[in-house]
Amino acid sequence: MITFPHRHLLGIKGLTEQDITLLLDRADEAVKISRQREKKTSSLRGLTQINLFFEASTRTQSSFELAGKRLGADVMNMSVGNSSVKKGETLIDTAMTLNAMHPDVLVVRHSSAGAASLLAQKVSCSVVNAGDGQHEHPTQALLDALTIRRAKGKLSRIIVAICGDVLHSRVARSNILLLNQMGARVRVVAPATLLPAGIAEMGAEVYHSMAEGLKDADVVMMLRLQRERMAGSFVPSVREYFHYYGLDAEKLKVAKDDALVMHPGPMNRGVEIASEIADGPQSVIEQQVEMGVAVRMAVMETLLLSQNQGPRL
């Protein structure tokens, strides 16, 4: 029997240390399933998962789809580009239409912060936030935490440096919340133009120099420079950005010798990370992809099989 006090996964905010640990422990079990020759279970047989992505994301959508299918669920991917949304239907109209089909879980990605929470108020099934604007991306933070925990054996009392375009990154926000909750020491390293207001109040130490921010770090998490979200001139040029904030061998030297190098993907090679580092021995970027499927399996199974579904987050 699974006991989990939440009906939805809308963000890391609202999860306790115990909630996070439960999800990570279940994800560890899901890793074993994914590494078997026979990868499919029947735990969610007869249940329906709808992936509703208003933003294109091949990686995340594929990961959620595979997670649901490995648990035996019926999975439907709704292509928004070919849907009534293009004809003027609102987010709520779409949600109500899908709700009438009686799905068991909606996985939602949307460009507007709070979209998943809004849907959760309108539908009778569970909702999983697969990224909402610059707000949160909870399953990414969970998979990052699982990757770190499996490599380091713990999350507490480690130094994690999150570097790059923090301003536009929902990944950074969710990771800061989770890592602080689990007792890690979190740093953000970025030019002032790529840092949101109030970042220090979230529990992150702020650095503007890679040499200082990466010193003795256990984990270096690089963020994609999200040029498609930029309305102004946040960086002088891509070349200058890489010179000061791109991760290369020289900058990595100040971190611990066994520091992990992470990236949520997709990468801009030569912009925020050099290929020699992305493909190097300290990189766990491929492991992050593997852990993503396991974490999403754990989330689906926990939400849908919980015997104690409580208030919405």
Curated annotation (Swiss-Prot):
One GO MF annotation is: amino acid binding
The catalytic activity of this protein is classed by the Enzyme Commission as: 2.1.3.2
Binding of carbamoyl phosphate: at which residues?
R59, T60, R109, H137, Q140, G265, P266
**UniProt xrefs under Pfam families:** OTCace, OTCace_N
Q: Which InterPro entries match?
A: Asp/Orn_carbamoyltranf_P-bd (IPR006132), Asp/Orn_carbamoylTrfase (IPR006130), Asp/Orn_carbamoylTrfase_sf (IPR036901), Asp_carbamoyltransf (IPR002082), Asp_carbamoyltransf_Asp/Orn-bd (IPR006131)
Supply one GO BP term: 'de novo' pyrimidine nucleobase biosynthetic process
Which UniProt keywords are listed?
A: Pyrimidine biosynthesis, Transferase
Q: Which residues bind L-aspartate?
A: K87, R170, R224
Q: Which GO terms describe its cellular component?
A: cytosol
Q: Which Gene3D superfamilies match?
A: Aspartate/ornithine carbamoyltransferase
Q: In what pathway does it function?
A: Pyrimidine metabolism; UMP biosynthesis via de novo pathway; (S)-dihydroorotate from bicarbonate: step 2/3
- Catalysed reactions listed for this entry: carbamoyl phosphate + L-aspartate = N-carbamoyl-L-aspartate + phosphate + H(+)
Q: Which PROSITE patterns does UniProt cross-reference here?
A: CARBAMOYLTRANSFERASE (PS00097)
> Main role?
Catalyzes the condensation of carbamoyl phosphate and aspartate to form carbamoyl aspartate and inorganic phosphate, the committed step in the de novo pyrimidine nucleotide biosynthesis pathway.
Alphabetical list of PANTHER family matching this protein: ASPARTATE CARBAMOYLTRANSFERASE, ORNITHINE CARBAMOYLTRANSFERASE, MITOCHONDRIAL
Its subunit composition reads: Heterododecamer (2C3:3R2) of six catalytic PyrB chains organized as two trimers (C3), and six regulatory PyrI chains organized as three dimers (R2).
What NCBIfam families does the record tag this protein with?
asp_carb_tr, PRK00856.1
Family, per entry: Belongs to the aspartate/ornithine carbamoyltransferase superfamily. ATCase family.
Output the HAMAP family linked to this UniProt entry: Asp_carb_tr (MF_00001)
Q: What is this protein called?
A: Aspartate carbamoyltransferase catalytic subunit
Origin species, per record, is Rhizobium meliloti (strain 1021)
Recite the lineage of the species: Bacteria, Pseudomonadati, Pseudomonadota, Alphaproteobacteria, Hyphomicrobiales
